[in-house]
Each structure stands twice: as structure tokens, then as C-alpha cells.
């Protein structure tokens, strides 16, 4: 099982990450990736960049060190209404929008609130993926959220950093998430959640988990660049002409 796209990476602009876009691209190339997404934290996260940072990603070349670069964000889920912290104008300029719960922005409360927030953000049509849903601090109703995600063509992320200790208790939940999504015929994305270049494309904990549950490779949108670009186009994103050869 191999994943040639990393849909979750951070740069120094996130405030608590330590590499540049160029350094991440070089690391991605060394890992043999075909593509990675730049997904810095959106403005409400402490230390995160101004919204201009996201609007100006258009200056980033589409290919760096022979690796395709997609322009994205890890937005914050703000409330149970499912609002996120970037406006429509900027979101429409980005290739890839993830939304995640983060403790400094949305303090965990109860299963009902978390479920309602996820359902609303999925229904909003503004996000392509839910980041690190395996975080045990944010319990939610798997059945309703995953079925709604499949209905709206929003994918759940299996996050390598969560499986490597950054969110204690995520291992069992991520396995349960993968098994449930497999059962309903849904799809997932895989992200390193790299905060340092050496971790870009690091799926050493994701791969054995997905093998363990026998997750179908065709339901993993990050298996190669074309499967990922096809997913974005399914979601109504404009084809990226510079990457048409992939």
C-alpha cells in the first residue's frame, strides 16, 4: 500500500511548524511523493497567519523539486453551526480545504455538540475533508457523520501524527473510523500533518493501520496524484491546467 499524495502539511507560517514550502517540497521529492498540499492553520489558531497568506498562495509555483504543490488550508471549526475561519472569497481560490477541531479554538464539550458541528460543516459545501477526526477529545456519532460525509463527498482523514502520539488515544478510534468508512463504502484521505520537513509524506503509522483493516486502496484518494485530482474535480473544483499531465 502506497500513498503518493500528502494532503496535510504545515510551514513556518503556522507559527509552531519549522520548515518552508521549499523545504517541504524537497522532502516530498526525497520521499518519492507526486504531490503535497500546503495546509497552514487558518487565522483563528494562535500563531496562525493573516488571511492574506492564504489568498496569496497563487504565487507558489505548481511544481517544486518535481513535486506538484496544491494550495490549501487547515481551517478551524468555530462552533456548532459549522462555521470556519476563512471567508468564501478566499476559500474559492484554494484547491483543498480541510476543517478540524482544535482545542484553542473550539473547546471540546460533548458528543452531541461535536456531531452537530461536523454535520453542519459537511453540509456547508465549503470543505473537502475533516482533519484528524480520530482525536478522542472530540467524540461524535460515527454513523450520522460518516453517512453525511459520503452523501456530500467529503472525506475523513487518517492522520499519521495522531497515530504517532500527538493526540493520545487516537489509535483505536482511527482504526474504528477506517473500519466504519470501509463498511459504508466511503473514502478517506491520508495526511502526515507534518510540522517539520522530514515528516512530509510520513505514513509509517497510517499504512499498517489501513492494511490491518483491509481498507480498499481504490477508496483512498491519496493513492496517487490523478486519483486526488479526480476527487477535487468531482467536488466541482476547476481542473488545474499546469497539472494536466499527471
Curated annotation (Swiss-Prot):
InterPro entries on file: Phosphatase_YcdX_put, PHP_dom, PHP_phosphatase, Pol/His_phosphatase_N, Pol/histidinol_Pase-like
Cofactors named for this entry: Zn(2+)
EC code: 3.1.3.-
Binding locations of Zn(2+) 1: 8, 10, 74, 193
Binding site for Zn(2+) 3: 74, 102, 132
Cofactor: how and how many bound: Binds 3 Zn(2+) ions per subunit.
PANTHER family, per database record: PHOSPHATASE YCDX-RELATED (PTHR36928:SF1)
Name the record gives this protein: Probable phosphatase PBPRB2022
Organism per entry: Photobacterium profundum (strain SS9)
Lineage: Bacteria, Pseudomonadati, Pseudomonadota, Gammaproteobacteria, Vibrionales
Amino acid at each position: 500500500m502506497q500513498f503518493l499524495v500528502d494532503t496535510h502539511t504545515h510551514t513556518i507560517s503556522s507559527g509552531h511548524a519549522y520548515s518552508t514550502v521549499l523545504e517541504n517540497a524537497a522532502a516530498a521529492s526525497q520521499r518519492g511523493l507526486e504531490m503535497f498540499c500546503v495546509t497552514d492553520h487558518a487565522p483563528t489558531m494562535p500563531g496562525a497567519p493573516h488571511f492574506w497568506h492564504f489568498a496569496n498562495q497563487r504565487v507558489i509555483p505548481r511544481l517544486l523539486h518535481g513535486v506538484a504543490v496544491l494550495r490549501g488550508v487547515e481551517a478551524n471549526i468555530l462552533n456548532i453551526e459549522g462555521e470556519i475561519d476563512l471567508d468564501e472569497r478566499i476559500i474559492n481560490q484554494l484547491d483543498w480545504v480541510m476543517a478540524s477541531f482544535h482545542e484553542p479554538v473550539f473547546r471540546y464539550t460533548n458528543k452531541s455538540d461535536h456531531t452537530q458541528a461536523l454535520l453542519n460543516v459537511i453540509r456547508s459545501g465549503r470543505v473537502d475533508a475533516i482533519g484528524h477526526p480520530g482525536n478522542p477529545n472530540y467524540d461524535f456519532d460515527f454513523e450520522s457523520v460518516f453517512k453525511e460525509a459520503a452523501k456530500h463527498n467529503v472525506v475523513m482523514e487518517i492522520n499519521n501524527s495522531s497515530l504517532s502520539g500527538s493526540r493520545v488515544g487516537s489509535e483505536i478510534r482511527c482504526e474504528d473510523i477506517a473500519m466504519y468508512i470501509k463498511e459504508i463504502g466511503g473514502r478517506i484521505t491520508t495526511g502526515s500533518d507534518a510540522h517539520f520537513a522530514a515528516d512530509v509524506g510520513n505514513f509509517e503509522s497510517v499504512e499498517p493501520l489501513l492494511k490491518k483493516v483491509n481498507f480498499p486502496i481504490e477508496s483512498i484518494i491519496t493513492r496517487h496524484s490523478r486519483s486526488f485530482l479526480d476527487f477535487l474535480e468531482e467536488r466541482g473544483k476547476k481542473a488545474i491546467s499546469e497539472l494536466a499531465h499527471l
